[in-house]
Each structure stands twice: as C-alpha cells, then as structure tokens.
Amino acid sequence: MWTFPVDYDVIVIGAGHAGCEAAYCAAKMGASVLLLTSNLDTIAKLSCNPAVGGIGKGHIVREIDALGGIMAEITDLSGIQFRILNQTKGPAVRAPRAQVDKQLYHIHMKRLLEQVPGLHIMQGTAEALLDNGEKVLGVSTKEGWAYLGKTVVLSSGTFMRGLIHIGTQNFSGGRLGDAASLGLSEDLKRLGFPLGRLKTGTPARLLASSIDFSVMEEQPGDHNVCFVHRNEMFVPTLPQVSCHITHTTDQTKDLITKNLHRSALYGGRIEGVGPRYCPSIEDKIVKFADKDRHHIFIEPEGLNTQEVYVNGLSTSMPFDVQYDIIRSVSGLENAIITRPAYAIEYDYVHGNVIFPSLESKLIEGLFLCGQINGTTGYEEAAAQGLIAGVNAVNKVLRHPPFVPSRQESYIGVMLDDLTTQVLDEPYRMFTSRAEHRLLLRQDNAGMRLSHYGHSLGLLSSERYAMFQEQKACIEQEKERLSKTFRKYGDTVVPLTKVLCRPEVSYQQLLTEFPADVRDLGPVVGASLEMEIKYSGYISRQQTLIRSMERSENISIPEDIDYHSISALSLEAREKLSKFTPRTIGSAARISGISVADIQVLMVSLKKDAH
C-alpha cells in the first residue's frame, strides 16, 4: 500500500458538521491537518432539516462562536429566516433558530475551509485505522493508499454500517444517495470498541409549486436575530422567506393506523432506537392516540430551489403509503414528492470508552465526535468537533486537554453527559439538561467562554476585546444604576429596582430616565436587563456552584482500583470501573452511583492522599 508522502498532526475522517469544525479549529491552532471525505460536494451537507439552532441547540451554536468556531458564521451567511424561540418565556430558554439555504451553507463552508492555511481537504473513503495496538498512526483508504498522522479524529456521522429503510425495503447507505462505510465498524470492533445501534429519520421533500399555501398559517422571521456575537444590529445578507404551518387530518390518522404493519419501525425491521424528541409520524399517532391532529411545518430548503422540507412528517412507511399520507395533509392534496422519507440505522460507540476530551480510552490519539458518540443534531456534532479538534492539537503539543465544565457551558453539559451516562436513545441537547441554565443564556456565551477561545488561538484579539468590553460595560452600568436613586411611583428607589419590575424593559428605562441611563445599544442593553432582572436567582446559582466546586473538581487517579474499595456497592464498583470518571463530580452523575458511594470514594481518596 502506497503511503502519502506528508505526515499530518491531525487527520479528520468525515466532513460533516463535526469534521468541518474539528479540521478548522485544529488548523487555526497551527496544526497540519488532513480533512478526508468521501465526497467533496457534500461537505457540511444538511442531511435532514434546513435549519440551525433552536432550544438548547441555539445556545450551543452561540458557544461555538464564543470559542472561535465557524458554525455561527456560516449560519449567518446562509440564513434565509431568523427567529427567537420562546420569546414569551424566561431568558434561560430563549434561543435563536435559522432556516438556511442548504446549498449556500455547503458552498460557504467549503470556501472557508479551502482558505485555511495548513488544512488539506482530500476526497477519499477511510477504510481502516492504522495503529500499533496502543496508539493510532493514521488511516488507510478504500482507494488503496494510506495517510499517516499523530492523531486521528473520527466523525463518521450516520455512515458506519448505515442501513436505510423505506417500508419493507432496506439497503446500505450513509444517507440517501451516499454509500455507507463498512470497514470502520469492523476495525473499531477489532480494537475492542463496544458498538451500539441507533436510528434516525428524515421526511419527504416536496415541490413548493404543488402546495396550496393559502390554507396554511404563515410564519415569518424576526428582526435582529443572529448567531455571531455582534455589538451592532444584524442585517441578513440574503432575502428572507417565511415558513408555513399546517396539520394532519383524520384521514392521515386512519392511513397510518391501517398501515402500521408496513412501517419499518413497527414492522420489527429496525433494530436501533430513535430520538424520543423527534419522533416519526407513525410514532406520534401511536403514542398520542388521543390527539386528532399534529402540526406540520413547511420549511424552504433554499432560495434557488423549489424543494421544501416537511417538518413533522418523518416516516419509514413504504413509498405508496407516504404518497397517500402526504396528500391527506391540509394544503398538500396535490403535492409532488421530490425525495422520499426514510429511516436510517447506524453504529455508534458507547460513551464509557471515551474521555470528556473526546479521546478514546482504548487507542491513544484517536478522538471521536458527532453521531458516532450517540448524539443527534448538527449543533451537537459541531460542538464535539471543536472539542475533538482542539484536543487533538493539545495531544500533539503535549498540552492538557480542554474540557469546559457543565457549570459554565452547554458544551460542558453534553461532554459530561456523554461520558457518564448509558445512552438508550440518540442524545439531543435541551436547556433542561443544565442545572444552572440561567447562567448559561445564549446572550452571554461570549462573556462566559471567549477567554478560552482567545487563549487557544481560535478567537481573534479584536473579537475577544469586544466581549471584554461588553462584560465591563454591563458590570459598570449595573454598579452605576444601583447607586442612582430616582422617584418611581410613590417611593425613591435605585434604578436597578425599577428595572427589576417585570413590566419595565431596558428600552423603557432609557426613555423614562434618559439623563441617568447609558445607552448600551440593543444587544448589550438586553443582556444588562437580564442580569439585573434575574440578579437574585443568578446570585443564588453562583453561590450553589461555589459550594459544589469544592467536591466537584476533586480528581480521581487514572490507575484507581475500584474493586479494591470493599465499602463501595457492587454496582458502584462495576460502573465506576466501566466509565473511569476523572472527577468526583463526574462520578456522582453516573446512573446508579449513590450519595453513600461517593462518600466512600472520597474517604478512600483522602486515605490514599495521606
């Protein structure tokens, strides 16, 4: 086998959302990087919905931007509708979401990656890892040659032994139109990796000109919503479009009920478990039998195509049943299908063999990110890609790994969850997964995390200075307003107390007391308002975190023998040995580990220390 004459610091396998972020970040840190993908024309392809962000997910994209990653930038360049979800709810759960032009998203990502110094993008299909039994050495390809590298980042998406289901038909594929990767799964098994099987799905695509939008509810976008942190108002570069909302009918319900036995999911042909919070339409009909109808969202796939995505109508039914189901939906009576819906099963690696840095515990220098770790979603994948890319370079440079904590980021919540929990379904980020979500708002991601991005060499000094200035402005104005007393109603109170009232906004305060309130602009002003309005809750959460940190960050030696600690329960010994947590905090979050087990472990660690 011929070996390519260049040795790389980092080899990234797969150019989906995880792989693109990993390759970009590694190269920006000064590493020589190979990004290996089976098809250059599908770089950063949005395989499912034409959207980025949402509740929890939008928070992650803002964190990626704060750390110096690229998903936010590409989303803003490609966005054809921007919205803030949960506007009427509390600030912790408000989140940006964008409809993007799928073709432009790919084009912008490919163009950006091609301009990064030190990054070599190459078409080729990874077939097997090269290793010496302890350390990864590179990768061999289906085409018959090899690449050598000091580290390898594996971001295979749904391609590992991918199996596509449409009714009773199934065939190999990484997604519809692309071949599956068969060799990598076998190679990981050879190396001792425990593999599981998960499932996801995507709905049919329809021709917009065949849809009756007049019977649907129009859903326009919002103004001044974006993913890249800015001081100024955001004006999209592309024309903005609307989505539309329709619903299923009694006929839809009857069709699905009568044909359940023909569904790949209910016919017993699918082995993998699907995402609970993104169910197929047949799942909804079965599990919510009391509901007469379900909402369907019609989302445009781009400005230069008539194709639309039918959000809420994912299915693994046969194509003839899909045809009837679609035409039973209000406004879709004459719809023309351009691509069928399908379900896909794929292999993933269990989290107990992965460190929070995303390095494998079994083979040194091998990092895993994205759906191979059991997650679902572009945003979760991109965040893991950033972490894996950064830590692959840290490995080469012999620097300690970068692992943000769950107290300071949603990315940290995800890393901790993936490496301490047994997944029984694809992992999706929600704000409810974070214990301190009021501290992890989407508006303050830059103030929370930009110092990491700057120290890693990913975030420019100019952008870091912007975040520092925003933070300083908010702290100074909070202090000033707390000392500025004015009459409001019948009493004289500090202006911070006025802003704490639920009916008073920062803009109203600015209008009513123009001589006393500094105009920080709409972006920083909104953050100031949240910091003041929720200061009591924020202070309590910060106090709780400080009290927990004393035990949370106690390190556990890598060579600890849990089976020798007889006071631990049998379940605790087995699970701690399986997951090998690095800290007491991580150990405490493993399912089945009791408070008593943690107390025993801490006593044992103190004895060993003495």
Curated annotation (Swiss-Prot):
Database matches in Pfam families: GIDA (PF01134), GIDA_C_1st (PF21680), SAM_GIDA_C (PF13932)
GO BP annotation list: tRNA methylation; tRNA wobble uridine modification
Subcellular location(s) per record: Cytoplasm
Cofactor(s) it depends on: FAD
Residues where NAD(+) binds: 274-288
Gene Ontology CC terms: cytosol
Assembly and binders: Homodimer. Heterotetramer of two MnmE and two MnmG subunits.
Protein name stated in the entry: tRNA uridine 5-carboxymethylaminomethyl modification enzyme MnmG
Organism annotation: Chlamydia trachomatis serovar D (strain ATCC VR-885 / DSM 19411 / UW-3/Cx)
